Amino acid sequence: MARTVFCEYLKQESEGLDFQLYPGELGKRIFDSISKQAWREWMKKQTMLVNEKKLNMMNADHRQLLEQEMVNFLFEGKDVHIEGYVPPTE
């Protein structure tokens, strides 16, 4: 049976992650309170950020920026702003 969590991003019970994907205390917080669906949404935003801002994960400042954006997105309800990006309309 799938593990469920109360997802802080979706504000509802949802299927939890299978294992801790991020190290440290932040990783534990993500594992305990972020759903698979919310994590997938973050991964899309992360990919856009890395590509559009040309982030280098070998650079500590870039990793710190990405981590802060992740916290803002998953826990503080702030959307990721990517200059020049216009979401598609349905």
UniProtKB/Swiss-Prot annotation:
Molecular functions (GO terms): iron ion binding
Annotated Gene Ontology cellular component terms: cytosol
SUPFAM superfamilies named in the record: YggX-like
InterPro entries assigned: Fe_traffick_prot_YggX, Fe_traffick_prot_YggX_sf
Pfam family, one: Iron_traffic
Keywords on record: Iron
SS bond partners: none
GO BP: any one term: cellular response to oxidative stress
Keyword Protease part of the UniProt annotation: no
Family note: Belongs to the Fe(2+)-trafficking protein family.
PANTHER family in UniProt: FE(2+)-TRAFFICKING PROTEIN-RELATED
Function text: Could be a mediator in iron transactions between iron acquisition and iron-requiring processes, such as synthesis and/or repair of Fe-S clusters in biosynthetic enzymes.
HAMAP family named in the record: Fe_traffic_YggX
Listed name of the protein: Probable Fe(2+)-trafficking protein
Species assigned in the record: Pasteurella multocida (strain Pm70)
